[in-house]
């Protein structure tokens, strides 16, 4: 029977028969007794990963340029005032590193990636108000969260303190014995690049090179070390042209010189996803829950690695666009107004913008169609059954299960019976694939055990990050108050 599912999974012209086949499969499982159930369980073993690898390991088939492009487009949506900021800051740092010399391609790639990602902790409008002021002190929140995301979820842990201290003055940094000299220098370079961009992005300052140079001299060995100021002055970014907006072709070449490993690409993607999910305590595990349910269903239906991989990738990417939705809408403790609901629904279009042409059409469509319904009543395109293949239907169902079983600002977590009641009701109304819903009902306990196993450590990380945030904030504010 596994061969039947594998065939249907990939034969687009026969997908209409899929619900019938699943129903037949479930009927056979129930009627052939213990031996059939043992065989069904053994089918799981056939698609187990290699020893030492997670069942949920996946490969996102994108290049360095693609993964960085996804990150840049995502950050463009955090706030209009930060549009292109990370990319421009990375280019300024690139010019400073070129002026200094001595960096290996790997070091340059990692520091440029860090520059693109440096505001990953920024999502609160009130703090962004301060971030886009040229001279400001109230910016610890995003620096701490950015540091924690890098420390917990990336393979750039050794550079995470660069983000933590990228708004610290040189007078504070130079006496920190627990911070290495390379980290101090990189943090200073990042801060100076950040301030240069903020200054010249203000239309009033576009032609004002002299005031900026005066500012640098005033802050020499106070806010910025003499070393990094002189590095900046050795670039073409301030004298004579101030033309830092165009991205050098060499920048892209450096980013492609040393390809990211699959693990590194996954870590960048995870940071993006958790930066979105962690905006609310109610959605911490939403993406990973959706992904686990999706992959479990795909594994049960067909064991081909590439098919399961597409489903997993699509599920992981499905809510990236929520980075551009205001927190007050995501966290609204009640029914949204029609206007607010339209804003919320726009997250699918924003996801499409973020993904661009950086992923395959198969993966992109899985991500973009998770709110479509078989009867055409879904969004954003009102697609019908004939337009929706099995992988897309799987993720749509998994997303609903994750939403129902999780807490939200407007509801508590649904019980098993209530969740399955909603799903079967939607299947009976022709909204969801009845075959996949039937399989989920049959395997619900097993699938949700996998969800709990996978989400437990993430919840622990989330709580630990919250505790560390307050601890670090207290320490930094104490140091800031020292003479």
What positions do the PLM features span?
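Histidine- and acidic-residue-rich, metal-dependent catalytic cores
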Residues: 52, 56-483
């Amino acid at each position: 029977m596994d061969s039947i599912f594998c065939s249907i999974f990939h034969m687009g012209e026969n997908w209409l028969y899929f619900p019938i086949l699943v129903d037949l499969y479930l009927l056979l499982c129930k009627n052939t007794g213990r031996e059939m159930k043992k065989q069904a369980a053994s089918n799981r073993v056939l698609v187990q990963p290699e020893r030492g690898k997670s069942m949920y390991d996946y490969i996102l088939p994108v290049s360095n340029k693609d993964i960085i492009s996804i990150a840049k487009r995502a950050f463009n949506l955090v706030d209009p005032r930060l549009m292109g900021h990370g990319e421009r800051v990375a280019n300024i740092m690139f010019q400073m590193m070129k002026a200094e010399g001595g960096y290996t391609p790997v070091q340059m790639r990692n520091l440029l990636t860090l520059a693109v990602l440096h505001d990953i902790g920024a999502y609160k409008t009130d703090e962004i108000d301060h971030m886009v002021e040229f001279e400001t002190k109230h910016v610890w929140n995003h620096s701490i969260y950015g540091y924690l995301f890098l420390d917990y979820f990336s393979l750039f842990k050794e550079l995470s303190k660069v983000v933590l201290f990228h708004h610290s003055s040189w007078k504070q940094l130079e006496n920190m014995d627990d911070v290495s000299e390379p980290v101090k220098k990189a943090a200073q370079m990042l801060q100076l690049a950040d301030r240069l961009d903020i200054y010249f992005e203000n239309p009033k300052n576009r032609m004002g090179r002299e005031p900026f140079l005066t500012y640098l001299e005033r802050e020499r060995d106070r806010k910025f070390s003499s070393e990094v100021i002189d590095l900046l002055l050795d670039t073409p970014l301030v004298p004579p042209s101030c033309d830092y907006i165009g991205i050098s072709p060499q920048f892209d070449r450096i980013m492609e010189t040393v390809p990211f490993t699959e693990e590194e690409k996954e870590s960048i993607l995870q940071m993006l996803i958790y930066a979105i999910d962690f905006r609310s305590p109610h959605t911490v595990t939403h993406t990973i829950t959706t992904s686990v349910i999706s992959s479990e269903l795909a594994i049960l239906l067909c064991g081909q690695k590439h098919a399961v991989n597409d489903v997993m990738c699509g599920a992981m990417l499905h809510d990236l666009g929520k980075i551009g939705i205001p927190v007050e809408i995501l966290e609204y403790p009640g029914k949204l107004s029609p206007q607010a609901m339209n804003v919320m629904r726009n997250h699918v279009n924003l996801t499409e913008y973020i993904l661009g042409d950086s992923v395959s059409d198969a993966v992109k469509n899985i991500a973009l169609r998770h709110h479509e319904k078989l009867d055409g009543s879904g969004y954003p395109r009102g697609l019908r059954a004939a337009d929706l293949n099995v992988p897309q239907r799987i993720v749509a169902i998994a997303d609903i299960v994750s939403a129902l079983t999780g807490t939200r600002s407007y509801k508590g977590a649904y019980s098993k019976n209530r969740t399955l009641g909603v799903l079967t009701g939607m299947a009976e109304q022709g909204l969801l694939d009845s075959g996949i819903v039937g399989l989920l009902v049959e395997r619900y306990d097993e699938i949700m055990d996998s969800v709990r196993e996978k989400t437990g450590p993430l919840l622990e990380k989330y709580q630990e990050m919250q505790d560390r945030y307050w601890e670090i904030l207290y320490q930094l504010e104490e140091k800031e108050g020292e003479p």
